[in-house]
A protein has these predicted regions:
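Outer-membrane beta-barrel translocator domains and adjoining extracellular loop/strand segments
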Residues: 1-7, 40-47, 75-82, 89, ...
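Surface-exposed extracellular loop regions of Gram-negative outer-membrane beta-barrel proteins
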Residues: 6-39, 43-49, 168
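Residues on the lipid-exposed face of transmembrane beta-strands in outer-membrane beta-barrel proteins
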Residues: 17-21, 50-54, 101-105, 116, ...
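Short loop/turn motifs that connect adjacent beta-strands in outer-membrane beta-barrel proteins
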Residues: 22-25, 58-59, 109, 162-171, ...
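Transmembrane beta-barrel strands of outer-membrane/channel proteins
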Residues: 30-36, 50, 64-68, 77, ...
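Outer-membrane beta-barrel signature, preferentially recognizing the C-terminal barrel domain
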Residues: 40-42, 55, 61, 68-122, ...
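Gram-negative outer-membrane beta-barrel transporters
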Residues: 118-120, 141-226, 280
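C-terminal beta-signal and adjacent terminal beta-strands/loops
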Residues: 122-123, 239-285
Length: 285
């Protein structure tokens, strides 16, 4: 039988204060979270946040946000110990500060979004390998990996064909691209990371929805992405067939229809062709 030899206890208390201000097309939401976690001490710590948006007209929206946050190490991070994982009871909580800015545009038949972000983290927690011995044994240990800065942007554009051509058999076309740049500062030579350093640098998505016959339609998705630190870029193609009625919906979904073998975050081998089917019923309640 499995024996559990570690236990922990901590109480987390949150007090939230928020105020919303609306004037014309301008909206401001500001707040602060007071947090006390007995896993640290009995003191309250304060984490502010601000969200702003401005709509000069019905087509445009501009927005920005900033917030601070704290993440406590989990009990797995602290206590686990086996042949492939080693926790650390001396972990510090990780601290994050994130700033986002963006704009949205919408008109008949077309929508677009452009956004950017900057995230600064200290004492970031990750599972890593720092020696050849750990690599040979496929063993990871958890640690605070230092300072981590992530910055990037996202661009999305969507064409709603039936708002432009009412009888078009193509209903929607979507194209998106996301990019992330990462700057990591640490005094430890990290050979392999499971999470934080295996970031998604490039991601391109293409989507197409169209009618087939009567109430039968299809939705196609093509995704290309490149994850850093030892991952090969790959392309994944998915398709979903749907029959829509007023009272119910039936679908069949095929993920990775090219049966491409690929690995994603934490070096886990992903499934080949994956087929799912389902239905939903509208009860009219």
């Amino acid at each position: 039988d499995r024996q559990y030899t570690r236990k922990g206890e901590r109480t987390n208390t949150n007090i939230m204060l928020e105020h919303n201000f609306i004037f014309g097309g301008f909206t401001l939401s500001a707040g602060v979270l007071a947090n006390k976690n007995t896993g640290l001490d009995n003191d309250f710590r304060f984490y502010p946040g601000v969200d702003m948006s401005y709509r000069p007209n019905d087509n445009w929206k501009f927005y920005a946000s900033w917030n601070k946050a704290l993440r406590m190490p989990t009990y797995t991070d602290l206590y686990i110990s086996n042949v492939v994982q080693q926790g650390d009871i001396n972990l510090n909580p990780e601290k994050n500060s994130t700033f986002k800015v963006g704009t949205q545009y919408r008109q008949a038949g077309f929508a677009a979004t452009v956004s950017g972000f900057y995230a600064h983290g200290t004492n970031m927690i990750d599972w890593v390998q720092t020696s050849v011995t750990e690599q040979n044994d496929s063993k990871y240990h958890v640690m605070n990996i230092g300072k981590l800065n992530n910055m990037g942007y996202n661009v999305d554009a969507t064409i709603y064909m039936r708002e432009l051509v009412p009888n078009s058999f193509i209903t929607r076309i979507k194209l998106g691209y996301a990019y992330i740049y990462q700057d990591h500062k640490t005094e430890t030579n990290i050979l392999k990371s499971l999470y934080a350093l295996e970031y998604l640098k490039h991601k391109v998505v293409f989507g197409l929805d169209h009618q087939i016959w009567n109430k039968l339609s299809a939705s196609w998705s093509v995704r290309w992405q490149q994850r850093m630190n030892g991952y090969h870029p790959y392309t994944k193609v998915d398709c979903k067939l749907m029959w829509d009625e007023k009272k119910y919906n039936i679908f069949v979904k095929a993920d990775n229809i090219t049966c491409h073998r690929y690995y994603d975050l934490t070096a886990v081998k992903q499934p080949g062709l994956w087929i799912m089917a389902g239905a939903s019923v509208n009860l009219g309640w």
